[in-house]
């Protein structure tokens, strides 16, 4: 068998495996929904507390008709994306500064570890007091969950750069900025992309925490409001939508990562 036919066979096998994996995921999800619906209808579980897929569909339809749901989704999505963009820019700039000034990195590293380990849910009430109950506070809450971990992750990626490549640029007369632009940043793109995939979920978590405490709109607000007035279908529906948003945003960044890796290998 020549190399070309072996490669085609391998690619067919790879595509088949991906299809099987996707089918298995869909089957598991569909089975879970069917079991949940059956358990609610047969009174194995209390449908008032645990709801059911059919109840969630009816609640979704009702909230769509009064146009309240899309507004809440849009607010949470906008806050999450703004938090993510700010975290991306600030963490990348901070990681660059740490790489350019190693002494500063040595001094600041323990402080970043401490700040990253703080319980963010405990910070949210303070943010409300300091900044007020507004969208800015929710965005800062979203940033607080992801920022310091992102800085440390990106800086660790910069430090993994091949030292021989850095020395080569320096031997050719390049300074630190040349090493950064020509070696460190290009070689760290996989770290950047993987960090971004984590950050988008963390920002969503932080935004929801902020909405729990100081918001009048958003999916986090719907969860708190629904639990207070015992509209548990609204609570569970909001959680399901949050899961869908997280999966969609993660999937989009995953597609960007795959596209970059495919182009870099090609």
Where are these regions (language model features)?
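Transmembrane-helix boundary motif in ABC transporter permease subunits
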Residues: 82-112
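Periplasmic/extracellular loop-to-transmembrane helix junction in inner-membrane transport proteins
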Residues: 10, 14, 18, 42-85
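Generic hydrophobic transmembrane alpha-helix motif, especially the helices
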Residues: 113-149, 156-157
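Short cytoplasmic-facing helical segments at TM-TM junctions of multi-pass membrane proteins
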Residues: 110, 153-198, 223
């Amino acid at each position: 068998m020549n190399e070309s036919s072996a490669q085609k066979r391998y690619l067919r096998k790879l595509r088949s495996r991906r299809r099987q994996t996707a089918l298995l995921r869909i089957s598991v999800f569909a089975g879970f929904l069917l079991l949940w619906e059956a358990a609610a209808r047969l009174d194995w579980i209390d449908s008032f507390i645990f709801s059911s897929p059919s109840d969630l569909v009816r609640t979704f339809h009702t909230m769509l008709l009064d146009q309240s749901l899309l507004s809440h989704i849009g607010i949470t999505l906008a806050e999450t994306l703004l938090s993510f963009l700010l975290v991306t820019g600030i963490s990348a700039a901070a990681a660059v500064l740490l790489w350019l000034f190693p002494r500063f990195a040595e001094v600041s590293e323990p402080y970043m570890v401490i700040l990253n380990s703080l319980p963010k849910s405990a910070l949210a009430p303070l943010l409300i007091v300091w900044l007020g109950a507004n969208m800015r506070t929710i965005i800062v809450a979203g940033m607080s969950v992801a920022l310091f971990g992102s800085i440390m992750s990106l800086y660790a990626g910069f430090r993994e750069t091949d030292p021989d490549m850095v020395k080569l640029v320096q031997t050719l007369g390049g300074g630190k900025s040349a090493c950064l632009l020509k070696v460190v940043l290009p070689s760290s793109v996989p770290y950047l992309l993987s960090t971004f995939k984590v950050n988008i979920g963390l920002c969503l978590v932080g935004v929801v925490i902020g909405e729990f405490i100081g918001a009048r709109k958003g999916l986090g607000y719907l969860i708190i409001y629904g639990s207070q007035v015992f509209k548990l279908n609204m609570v569970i529906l909001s959680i399901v939508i949050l899961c869908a948003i997280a999966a969609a945003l993660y999937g989009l960044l995953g597609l960007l990562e795959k596209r970059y890796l495919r182009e870099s290998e090609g």
